[in-house]
Amino acid sequence: IIAFAYGMRSKKRIQDGIKYGLIYTVALMIIGIAITEIFPGAFATLFNAGQSREYFIGAMRVISVSFLFAGINVAYQGIYQALDGGVESLVISLLRQLIIILPLAGIFSLFVRNGQMGISLIWWAFPVTEVIACLVGYVFLKKIRKNRVNTLI
C-alpha cells in the first residue's frame, strides 16, 4: 500500500499507510506478548520441552518482551522497501540478526559463565537488540520521511 502511494506521489496515503501499519503491528504484537506471557506452558508443550520446560518458559517470557519491538522493526523494513530504502532495510536486518545480537549474547554469556548472573541474562539479548534496532529504525524513518516523502509535490 505504501509503495503504491509512493508511486502515486501521495504524501497523505504514505503517511496513513505508515501510521496504520505501525498501529496494527503494535496491537498485534501486544496480543502476542499477552498470549505468550499468560500461556507459556502451552508453548512449552507444543515444542515438547520435556525436562527443559522451566528453562523454555523462562526464555519465552523474556523473549516475548521483544515481540513489540521486533514487530515494529519488521514494519520499518517493509516501509523502507516501499519507499526505495533497501539499504536501510538491510541495515536493520543485519543489526537484528548479526551485528548486535551475537556480540551481546556473547558478552552476556561471560557474566553467566562467571557465575555473576543467571542463564536468563542471555535471553535478554533479544529484547535489548530489538530496542536498539528500533531506535536506529526510527532515525532511518525520520530521514526517509524528510528526504523522500516530504519532498513529494
Segments (PLM) and residue ranges:
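Short membrane-interface helical motifs at transmembrane helix boundaries
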Residues: 31-53, 57
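Small-residue-rich hydrophobic transmembrane alpha-helices
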Residues: 1-38, 72-84, 88-89
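Residue-level recognition of transmembrane alpha-helices
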Residues: 25, 60-63, 67, 93-94, ...
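Intrinsic disorder in cytosolic terminal tails and internal cytosolic loops
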Residues: 146-153
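Alpha-helical transmembrane segments of multipass membrane proteins
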Residues: 28, 32, 36, 66, ...
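Structural signal for membrane-spanning alpha-helices in multi-pass inner-membrane proteins
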Residues: 36, 78, 104-109, 137-141
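Membrane-interface helix-loop junctions in multi-pass transport and translocation proteins
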Residues: 45, 87, 97-135, 145
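Alpha-helical transmembrane segments of multi-pass membrane proteins
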Residues: 51-76
